[in-house]
Amino acid sequence: DLVQNTASCPQGCGSFTRGLNGGGQASPSYFSTINSFNYDSLGNAVDFGDLSQARRLMAAFGDTQRGCWAGGITPSANVNTIDFITIASAGTATDFGDLNEVKDSPQSGSDSHQGLEEFFPRAPELYSPTGKVLPSGGGVGDIGIFAGGNGTSNIIQFITIASTGNAVDFGDKTVGVFSPGGLGSTVRAVFAGGEDPSANVDTIDYVEFRSKGNAADFGNLTAARRALA
């Protein structure tokens, strides 16, 4: 069992040995709790610490040393906060910086080395005062990227996981969408589907982590849809 019943929209990240689950909601309450569990032993999660804010629908991502939570929604507003923790050391999350846009329900992803936001944020499920929602993200090496959001955002942002600081501009998606899906490899991040917002779209576009710039067309989904896992 988790330390706290956060049935609605918590987000998780981890290392090779430890998994972390943070935030979430059990209506009407929002939580900041970070749960910790080790992969090699069965049993209940233990209290790791707390996020800086009680919230849900964040993006979560990390490398082998750090875990990060970005964006999300509190009981009163969408936020652009990025928190981080050191996975090996329990404690309260520390400020990393801010997203360029306020977003909830981002996507995230990372490889086994270092990736940002997101083991890819869900809903799709990966950024500031504009109240963006449902971005997607991916990461490789020490870079994590985020894209999309409410208001049909086409903005792609990135951060460097090993340091701290605000997210910066990476480029633009080929189409502005809400609630796309995100995935990636060690070379590319791919964004699929979403809502524009009058209708779902079937667009798939991609960027390469090492080459900042606008996304390029990859192809199309078999059906137009949003909130892909």
For each predicted feature, which ranges?
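Polar, enzyme-active/binding microenvironments
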Residues: 1-229
